[in-house]
Design a protein with these regions (language model features):
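Conserved PDZ fold ligand-binding element
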Residues: 50, 56-57, 254-277
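PDZ peptide-recognition modules
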Residues: 223, 249, 263, 273-277, ...
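Short, structured beta-strand/loop micro-motifs enriched in basic residues and often containing a Trp
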Residues: 100-106, 246-250, 276-277
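PDZ domains, with a preference for the canonical peptide-binding region formed by the helix
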Residues: 64, 256, 268-296
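Serine-dependent protease modules
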Residues: 1-231, 241-242, 285, 301-304, ...
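PDZ/PDZ-like domain micro-motif
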Residues: 169-170, 229-237, 250-268
Length: 317
């Protein structure tokens, strides 16, 4: 007798089978360290998934600096991979192969902005080098997590308790409809049930940048800003309790040319109120194809004004 649970179980089995066909294992060989026996190669392992005709997306840290990249599909077929793009700043890379097994289709990309905490997700990949895609189930534990360093900026990460192990990096995180909502990127060693995935919308933005510029780029307008908190508002005697306080403007940048100055307060971006500096960074990246970002600026003694600030781009690794 059919029950809602059995129906859901059958649906999950169908989704997982369809998704797994487009997931690959990626093995790499990189130059290693020097020894008395010569250079010792370093072998690496990761996952990836098909997003276009003979195009696979994975993490940049999986394939960066690799001398040899092998791509293995679910049926065991193996192809030489060529790294097309490796955006180490966002940890996204594209790898091409000459051919794919018959009948394999690119995975469908969802909308990670619609993810909700508690939503069921599946991580698909090749943990520990085990043959064939492995599937684990969990939920979205949190969204908006950040891992930021000097050469990397992983923002708005999806946190999940779906089991993630070494080798899962680059594999898809999919929802119950089989839509890719993220790409697995990191785990915290010794922490049970804490893994992270790059939102698929971030991957989409990288693809748009590559289509427009031929390479990954970093978007900016040339300001340093701080989120206004009650403490910041009190310390600087600010007239507003919400927004982004401009603390520095880089000379020669679009913001400088738009006459934005330290002490100004960004109150809205594209007509929406703003309170977190991460919203500015994201809005600038989201507007890269548009070429400008529209800001509402408040300056004490002068009131509010709206300004369209052009976006400048610089190449990233």
């Amino acid at each position: 007798m059919a029950t809602p649970l059995k129906d859901f179980n059958e649906h999950v089995i169908k989704v997982v089978n369809e998704v797994s066909r487009g997931v690959v294992t990626i093995t790499t060989v990189k130059l290693g360290f020097e020894s008395i026996f010569g250079t010792v190669p370093i072998r690496g392992l990761g996952s990836g998934f098909l997003i276009g005709e003979n195009i696979i997306v994975t993490n940049a840290h999986v394939v960066s600096d690799a001398r040899v990249v092998d791509v293995i599909f679910f049926d065991g077929s193996r192809f030489d991979g060529k790294v097309l793009i490796a955006d180490t700043y966002r940890d996204v890379a594209l790898v091409s192969v000459e051919d794919v097994p018959k009948g394999i289709k690119p995975l469908s990309l969802g909308d990670s902005d619609q993810l909700r905490v508690g939503e069921i997700v599946f991580a698909v990949g090749s943990p520990l080098g085990l043959p064939g895609p492995t599937v684990t189930m969990g939920v979205v534990s949190a969204v908006g997590r950040n891992i930021v360093g000097e050469d990397v900026a992983l923002e708005d990460l999806i946190q999940t308790d779906a089991a993630i192990n070494p080798g899962n990096s680059g594999g898809p995180l999919v929802n119950v409809d089989g839509m890719v909502v993220g790409m697995v990127t990191a785990i915290i060693p010794y922490a049970q049930g804490v893994g992270f995935a790059i939102p698929i919308n971030t991957v989409k933005r990288v693809l748009e940048m590559i289509e427009a510029y031929g390479r990954p780029v970093r978007a900016m307008i040339g300001v340093y800003a701080a989120s206004i908190t009650p403490q910041v508002a009190s310390a600087y005697r600010l007239p507003l309790k919400r927004g982004l306080l401009i603390v520095r403007v880089i000379p020669g940048t679009p913001a400088y040319e738009a006459r934005i100055a330290p002490g100004d307060i960004i109150t809205k971006i594209a007509g929406k109120e703003v309170s977190d500096v991460r919203e500015l960074r994201r809005a600038v990246e989201d507007s890269i194809m548009q070429g400008y970002v529209e800001l509402e600026i408040y300056r004490q003694g002068y009131g509010y004004r709206r300004v369209k600030v052009p976006i400048m781009v610089e190449e990233v690794g």
